[in-house]
Amino acid sequence: MKTIIVLSYFFCLALSQDYSESNNSTATLCLGHHAVPNGTIVKTITDDQIEVTNATELVQSSSTGKICNNPHRILDGRDCTLIDALLGDPHCDVFQDETWDLYVERSSAFSNCYPYDVPDYASLRSLVASSGTLEFITEGFTWTGVTQNGGSNACKRGPASGFFSRLNWLTKSGSTYPVLNVTMPNDDNFDKLYVWGVHHPSTNQEQTDLYVQASGRVTVSTRRSQQTIIPNIGSRPWVRGQSGRISIYWTIVKPGDVLVINSNGNLIAPRGYFKIRTGKSSIMRSDAPIDTCISECITPNGSIPNDKPFQNVNKITYGACPKYVKQSTLKLATGMRNVPEKKTRGLFVAIAGFIENGWEGMIDCWYGFRHQNSEGTGQAADLKSTQAAIDQINGKLNRVIEKTNEKFHQIEKEFSEVEGRIQDLENYVEDTKIDLWSYNAELLVALENQHTIDLTDSEMNKLFERTRRQLRENAEDMGSGCFKIYHKCDNACIESIRNGTYDHDIYRDEALNNRFQIKGVELKSGYKDWILWISFATSCFLLCVVLGGFIMWACQRGNIRCNICI
């Protein structure tokens, strides 16, 4: 019976600590941070899977599906390629003297004039596209002894045969085609683009019928360059009723230079020049519709917002656009490390601090206090720590955008079949650049995320240290982000701790007195198990001694007989 009494005493003593915490002479103050039930997973330098309370997506992965016509001037090419509009194909006359920021070529575009090729198609297309205008100035070339304004049934302008409006097809006059030698100086202060051509007849008969000579020659030169083209006579696949071809060439004449044209046949002469302007106009192949809206960034898929630093829509862009990366998602942490709140905390539902878990429900603040005292429980935010963290995180997204947004366009690059190896090299270089940028983007975001998490953890620790320095010996660090305050601390007292006006000297004597009284009977949780086990072992030992003594007493009285057989 004595053993049972002793065990009951120790058990009650072990539990007395829990109940003593609710004593009116003490209080508990816990520090915590914001938490959400379901956070967002982000990457850091040290961890690929870390949960935060909030994060912002940095990769734009979808377009509007339409091209916005503001603030950029968009010219819809409709049925005309840029080169057809440049040459003056009859069905492209509407584009004469047009200007643009972005010329949109459609997959439905077609040529509807004499079949031609441009040996340096990509360069001419890029040159005209970047110039941003089809402004054309007619000049008075003098072509003596030849017939001008040749036409073809393959190039109808209305019911009659026609030709490219910016070119002049010269043929024999009567039975002669004299040697032509024409000069045209550039007396202006800008570059001039002259477009000209050479006709390749399908047969020798066609050659002599048009130009008399069995073989023609065209030479176009300036002080800086010279091009000599000899026609290639021969049959080619029929296109719009023609097996002959025209090759289109171009020459840029600088201010103060002179254009010289020399030919004895097969010349497709220029009628004037195009003004070359330097700018950031461009061209893009796209079938996206053009709509009235505003967007700084345009891709072949349509316009996209540029409020993110990266995009995964298309590597061809125009305008101020996010940098293209391979990743479909990169999340920037804009909140702290998330530790979801535990819903059950044992029999007594004690409050807990940030080391155990976060607190849900702190919508307006990231850091705060919870307390338990004689007046009940409560919670309040710490605006100072919250604002300190937010100030450092705000602007992080804008800084990333400033570092990565391209203020120029990434144009399409085209090469002829002869330049296939250059095309392969260009593709390799572009792929390498994309790989490098994708890696840099992931590294940049991981670094920023690491900084954000370290920053928010640091602010939590600063708040804890600030509180600990205020309380000093009046409270004890419970090791879970909480303090046990050894004096009566009502709501006004708790508020003074939160706002930094707490005076520990006022409560020092009461706290020391209560600490000694409580410590006199308080058993630390670390010793409870030891005492219980020692009590149990002692009880068992005493029980065995009593049982052994009883057996020996009974044997002496003869009440118990023990026989040992060998």
From Swiss-Prot:
Protein name: Hemagglutinin
Organism listed in the record: Influenza A virus (strain A/Duck/Memphis/928/1974 H3N8)
Keywords: Clathrin- and caveolin-independent endocytosis of virus by host, Clathrin-mediated endocytosis of virus by host, Disulfide bond, Fusion of virus membrane with host endosomal membrane, Fusion of virus membrane with host membrane, Glycoprotein, Hemagglutinin, Host cell membrane, Host membrane, Host-virus interaction, Lipoprotein, Membrane, Palmitate, Signal, Transmembrane, Transmembrane helix, Viral attachment to host cell, Viral envelope protein, Viral penetration into host cytoplasm, Virion, Virus endocytosis by host, Virus entry into host cell
GO MF annotation list: host cell surface receptor binding
Topology term for the membrane: Single-pass type I membrane protein
Residues carrying lipid (S-palmitoyl cysteine): 555, 562, 565
Signal peptide: 1-16
Domain of life, source organism: Viruses
Positions glycosylated per UniProt: 23-24, 38, 54, 181, 301, 499
PTM comment, free text: Palmitoylated.
Pfam families membership: Hemagglutinin
A biological process term (GO) from this entry: virion attachment to host cell
Extracellular face residues: 17-530
Gene Ontology, cellular component aspect: host cell plasma membrane; membrane; viral envelope; virion membrane
Subunit record text: Homotrimer of disulfide-linked HA1-HA2.
InterPro entries (alphabetical): Capsid_hemagglutn, Hemagglutn_HA1_a/b_dom_sf, Hemagglutn_influenz_A, Hemagglutn_influenz_A/B
Subcellular location: Virion membrane; Host apical cell membrane
Role summary: Binds to sialic acid-containing receptors on the cell surface, bringing about the attachment of the virus particle to the cell. This attachment induces virion internalization of about two third of the virus particles through clathrin-dependent endocytosis and about one third through a clathrin- and caveolin-independent pathway. Plays a major role in the determination of host range restriction and virulence. Class I viral fusion protein.
